[in-house]
């Protein structure tokens, strides 16, 4: 097994083990249908089309009806579209609260190689953390990666001064 695949698999298993005592729900496999924006994706899951909202992250807006296009929004959406291509199969983990007020399914998303996509968005500066209880299984991990991205001034932390 190539070293990169083994490392990704080990990372995924460590993430799952770190949440062994949490209230994470079952994992589902889903097929990407389309990307709406940086943190919202449409998938096919169990022969049903669902809109997903990634837990613990908030990318700058590109399609919000009142906020317009925010700084680094197009880049965040572009990154998500590049990684989450239609047709790929991903693994979804749910936390305690299954849906948001817009009835989007709230998930942590893992790529076919085991990489944690929510984390990738934060560590590469495409998203800020957004901790909304009770869905906080990975909040400390994501906060740590946000701090690192800020310190390294990558992505929105370089381009968008608040």
Model-derived segments and spans:
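Small beta-barrel nucleic-acid-binding modules, primarily SNase/OB-fold domains
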Residues: 2-162
């Amino acid at each position: 097994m190539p070293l990169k695949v083994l490392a990704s698999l080990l990372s995924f298993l460590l993430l799952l083990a770190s949440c062994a005592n949490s209230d994470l729900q079952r994992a589902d496999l889903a097929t990407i249908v389309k990307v709406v924006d940086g943190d919202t994706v449409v998938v096919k899951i169990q022969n049903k089309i669902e809109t997903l909202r990634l837990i613990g992250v908030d990318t700058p807006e590109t399609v919000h009806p009142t906020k317009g296009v925010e700084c680094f929004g197009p880049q965040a959406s572009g990154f998500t579209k590049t990684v989450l291509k239609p047709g790929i199969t991903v693994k979804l983990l749910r936390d305690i609260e299954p849906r948001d007020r817009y009835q989007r399914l709230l998930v942590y998303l893992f790529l076919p190689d085991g990489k944690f996509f929510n984390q990738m968005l934060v560590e590469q500066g495409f998203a800020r953390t957004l901790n909304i209880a009770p869905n906080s299984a990975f909040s400390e991990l994501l906060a740590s990666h946000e701090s690192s991205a800020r310190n390294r001034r990558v992505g929105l932390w370089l381009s968008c001064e608040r």
